[in-house]
């Protein structure tokens, strides 16, 4: 892929993840510009990635060849009209946010149509992400391939229909947060039961890998899997946990998708 300049409009968590991975997979960070309204955020990014250019001017990041829109939807909606004049005719804008469809993005960018949307998730930081991507009709095949190359180091990036991206935001992007605190609690309890850190982590990792493999094994239904362990200490709490999933995640999906 031809060496391109890369801009990040927004310097938050997801930008840090992208820089961490892309910098380790061959992207020349001295061709990267990160813009943000927070001096503290920019200082953190510059400290961790000294080669990048940081600025409070979003148009500087938007003037790059490949532009990642790394803002939450309300902030992106406010910022986009001011970026339209900075975009070059051959630029590509890659939105990392849910909610803002290609139609909305194009309208806010004055008709700019060279667009992609990605829903990234946190395991990308170790190259194990699941980052569904959709391409706007105005983005040619060569540029689509370039976007995919940029995403390669982050993990898997299946091309999906745009209308499914908000579902992936709930399932894959936010999914780790539904489990991480539970795993940490198990890790802490294991220590209180007398296991060392190495022993607890080895057992927890193996259990999670084995449980995942079992859950998705085509030879077992969910009922088969659930019946494999006779003692279920949290069975009394399952109804409340399931209802919390339905209430919280169902409501959030409706908000993101406008359903």
What is the predicted role of each segment?
Residues 1-56, 62, 128, 189-193, ...:
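NAD(P)+-binding Rossmann beta1-loop-alpha1 motif at the extreme N-terminus of oxidoreductases
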Residues 2, 191, 198-259:
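NAD(P)-dependent Rossmann-like dehydrogenase/reductase catalytic/cofactor-binding core
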């Amino acid at each position: 892929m031809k060496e391109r300049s890369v801009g990040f409009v927004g310097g938050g968590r997801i930008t840090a993840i992208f820089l961490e991975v892309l910098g380790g997979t061959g992207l020349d960070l001295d061709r990267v510009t990160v813009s943000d309204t927070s001096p503290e955020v920019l200082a953190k990014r510059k400290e961790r990635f000294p080669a990048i250019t940081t600025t409070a001017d979003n148009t500087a990041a938007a003037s790059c060849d490949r532009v990642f829109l790394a803002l939450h939807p309300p902030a992106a909606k406010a910022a986009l009209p001011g970026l339209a004049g900075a975009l070059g005719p051959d630029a590509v804008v890659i939105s990392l946010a849910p909610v803002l469809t290609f139609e909305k993005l194009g309208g806010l960018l004055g008709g700019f149509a060279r667009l992609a949307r990605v829903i990234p998730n946190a395991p990308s930081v170790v190259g194990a992400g699941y980052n569904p991507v959709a391409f706007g009709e105005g983005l040619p095949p060569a540029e689509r391939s370039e976007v995919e190359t940029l995403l390669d180091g982050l993990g898997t990036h299946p091309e999906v229909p745009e209308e499914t991206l908000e579902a992936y935001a709930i399932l894959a992007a936010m999914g780790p947060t539904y489990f991480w605190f539970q795993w940490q609690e198990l890790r802490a309890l294991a220590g209180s039961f007398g296991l060392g850190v190495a022993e607890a982590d080895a057992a927890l990792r193996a259990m999670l890998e084995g449980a995942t493999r079992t859950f998705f094994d085509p030879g077992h239904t969910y009922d088969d899997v659930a019946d494999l362990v006779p003692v279920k200490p949290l069975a009394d709490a399952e109804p409340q946990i399931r209802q919390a999933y339905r209430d919280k995640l169902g409501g959030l999906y409706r908000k993101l998708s406008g359903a």
